Every structure is written in C-alpha cells, then in structure tokens.
Amino acid sequence: MTALRGAAAAALDGVRDRNQSAWLLTPDGSRTRPDLRDGMRRYADTDEVDIAIVGCGAGGSVLLQRLARAGWSAVAFDAGPFWEPGRDWVSDEAGSHHLYWTEPRQIGGGDPVPLGSNNSGRGVGGSMVHYAGYVPRFHPSDFLTRTNDGVGADWPISYDELRPFYEDIENELPVAGEDWPWGDPHSYPHGPHPVSGNGETFLRGANVAGITAKVGPVAITNGRFGHRPHCIYRGFCLQGCKVNAKASPLITHIPDALDHGAEVRADCMVSSIEVDERTGRAIGVHYFRDGVPRFQQARMVAIAGYSIETPRLLLNSASTRFPDGLCNEFDQVGRYLMVQGAPQTAGRFSDEIRMWKAPPPEVSTEQFYETDPTKPYKRGYSIQTVSPLPITWAEHVMAQGHWGADLRRYMSDYVHWACLGALCEFLPQPDNRVTLADEKDRYGLPVAHFSYTQCDNDRALAKAAQATMERILEAAGAQETMTVQRYAHLVGGARMAADETEGVVDANCRTFAVPNLLITDGSVLPTQGSANPALTIMAVAARAADRLIERPEP
C-alpha cells in the first residue's frame, strides 16, 4: 500500500511539473486566482509576440500553455468572455444559451445540421465548458480507415505517435474510469465514479444482451485534485460545472499559461490573418475589441476556432496572394466537415431511474466501434448513457408527436425513463463543407454557410445503433422505447494530410501554404471516429506544440 501511495504521489508530481493549473485556482476551487487574471502579462499591439493564437478552446488552450511554459511570448484571443463559473453559469437549461456560439450562421444541404448549441462554444474554454466531460481516445483503426476499410481517409500520423500525448492529457485533466478494453487497452489515472440509476440500467441490459459495458472515462475529478473539488453529481455538466470538478481548458490549462506569462484577450473577435504579400508569411491578426478594429503583430499565428469558424476565418483572410481564401489554393478549406450521428433512445421503467443524477455520459460500450465484415456498412458506433434534462426531454417527447395532455403525462413520468445515446462515425465527404454566405455579421464579415448531407453508410449506421440501444433497454426491462435523431461533435474542415492537394495542414499542424501558420483544433481531424473528440483535439495540439518547440522554423 505504501508503494502504491508513493507511485501515485510520483505521478501527481509529474503532472505538476508540466501543468500547475489545478493548484492555481482559489482554495475553494471556484475560479482562477484573481491575481493571475488581473495581473496577467499584457502585450501591446505593436509588440511582435512570438505567437498569436485564435481561440481558447481544447486546442488553443493546450498550445498556449505549452508554449508559455517554453518561454514564448504568446497572446490568445477569444470572441467570448473570460468566464467566472460562480457568476456566469446557472443550473438551468434555458439560462445557459450564452455559453454557445449564437452569432449568425447559415445551414443547408440534404440533412442540415443545427448549429449554436451542443456543437459550439464562445468564451474562454470553448465548447468544453459545456461538454459532457466524456473523453475516450480514438482507436488505432481510426488512423487508417482508407487503408483498412476503404472509406474515409488515412491520417498522416499514427495512433502510436499520439499515445504519449493522450496519456499526458489524461493525467492533466485528470480522467476517471475503469480499465478500458477496446482499441488500445489502457487504464486511467483515477478510478471510476459511482454509477447512477441510468448507468445501472445500461449495465444490467448490456449484461443480459451479451454486450460489454464499462464505467467512464470522464474528465471529472473522483476526489479532490489540486484545489478542484469532488463531483457533486448535480447533473448540469452541459450547463457549465459551477464547482469546477469537470475539466475544461478554463481551469485545466489557462491558469498555468497565465502563470507562465501568457496573455488571454477575451471578448476579441479576430477578423482575418495578415500575410506579407512578398514573403508569404503570417505577420499578425486583425481583430475587433469593443467594436474598434485593431492589429496584433506576431512572428507566428495559430488558429484554433473549431470546424466552422476556422474555415470561415481562412476564407475571410483572402488577399492578392490568396484570392480564394488563405491556404485554399487546392480548394480544401472548409471541405470534409463531419458530424457524428447521435440518435438517443429512451426506455420507460416501472422503477424510478432519475437519469439526471450523474454526469450525462458515465457508462459506455465500444463493442461496435470497428468495421464488422458481416454488416452492410463500414466503421461503427459507440453507445453511452445520456441524461436529457426536462426541456431537452420535452423536445424528445414532442419529436414523437406527443402534445397536450399526452405531453404532460410523459413529462410527469420523467423520473421513470432511462436514456442511451450513440455516436456513429459519419464519413468525410468533400461536399459537406463551409463556404461564405452573402449575409454579414455585426462586424461586417461574411458569415459561414455549412452544407451537410448524409451518405447511405451514415444512415445505415444510425439505424443499427438505434436497434442496439433498443435491445439493451428492452433487455433491462423497458416497457416502452422512443428515439430522437440528432447530431453531435463537429470536426474537419481544415484537415491534416500527407499532401497539400488533399488537406490544409501537415502532420505537425502547420499549413502547407503559410510556413508560420498553424491550425490546432478539431478542424484538422481527417476522420471522426465513434469517440467524443475533445481528448484527441487536446492530444493533437500537445503534439503540435512539442514539434513546434523542437523546431520553430519549418
């Protein structure tokens, strides 16, 4: 036992050696220490900083923290505010829409994807401030889907190259869960959380159906971590974690970046990247602060605005040298944008389930993640517990055609329902893309238009996932089931590739066209997988930072 405690202490010291963020919160864990925020380093626009980073979400915050620790002068911009969890977040669905990117956007295509809620974020921490906290890894097979399955695209990096960065981020968040048997089997820094009625229902049904399910992995502290408290299981992870038990860059990487001299400029909308017409190098960013246009000089620029805003920014950065948009000589910017199919199936039970009393995803199976040669579709899906809160639950019920007294009956029955959600690997297609619309936003910038249409393989996957969720719930004793079709998790739009004709960035997240411009967000992912992408985005950004520190010049 003493040896185990010693090993745990050594692992903790290793985390603190590379990321002190959890110890840089106030002692009650409620927010970043005020002296770090109020006394952060402030650069002038005329200071040529080493790097300007656009976006403070999963990718941008990790890059900022790594480079600040390496001694780089770094400024990160975010279009939204620097959140104060206790002040800005509420345990209320309707009162949490300010966490989303609600600026104008257009959607189209055969199967339009709603924007502005679960797949967007605006503010320091990005969409991770309102994500569910679920952080599985991608599988080794995700990196070779074209070679192995004849669909999607191969990554220019391998799973093995990303593994050490997965491990680092899992320790820094930290992640809690059972030993994971799928993909590359591995364990997690913290043990699993207690299981709720929803999770128990999933485990019981999966066992009867012959399906393996496991608890975790969640980026939620199971016990105190630094100044962060234990989860209190209030069930409002998607509305921002008021106690800061759930990890987000706002508390996991930003504090350490500030402590090492980085600046975070909140409420600053970056409008374009400036490129020197003679040298072809990025020299800074144009941005709006309090409605006033400004320009920050920088030796390098990194974009981390995610899969809608990153392509939009590149396209809005057109110039004489790049008339069709920055880095768009081969018409790759905005293409291959993906979502996951995310149908949710609920089952009614005679016992009370109280599905909201836990992190929304807490039990999962990845048994159906890989291509099954006996099935008529390629790739696969995962299944997790989900726990729609009352307003979302009402939307589920109304989607089945229930209104009036019937709707009221389903709402009063809320505590008797359990709910599962699938993540289906929808495939990258070139015509699923972001372009610029004629409409302009309040800054006078063309807004993004996102066109999306499913392929036959996508539809087959969603149908198969629904059937499996129904089987699990019925095996657990559900008396009735209902399913709502939905989407989750945008990725792609500026994908990494081995060749400039097939993508926007190389294996190290440098753009092919501009040698000192990087992209470090979910837009660089060539495929989607059936896993929540946050951990992979952070690991890719950590790897890009590592390569950049080793070799600042290409």
List the predicted regions and their residue ranges.
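Extreme N-terminal leader/targeting segments of oxidoreductases
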Residues: 1-51, 69-70, 550-554
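Glycine-rich loop(s) and the adjacent beta-strand/alpha-helix scaffold that form part
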Residues: 66-69, 73, 80-90, 243, ...
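Conserved redox-cofactor binding core of oxidoreductases
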Residues: 5-28, 111, 146-270, 490, ...
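FAD cofactor-binding and catalytic pocket of flavoenzymes
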Residues: 4, 17, 23-29, 107, ...
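N-terminal Rossmann-like FAD-binding beta1-loop-alpha1 element of flavoenzymes
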Residues: 49-76
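A glycine-rich dinucleotide-binding beta-alpha-beta segment and adjacent secondary-structure elements
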Residues: 19, 23-24, 48, 215-219, ...
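A conserved FAD-binding loop/helix module that cradles the flavin
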Residues: 527-546
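Redox-cofactor-proximal catalytic regions of oxidoreductases
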Residues: 95-182, 371, 430
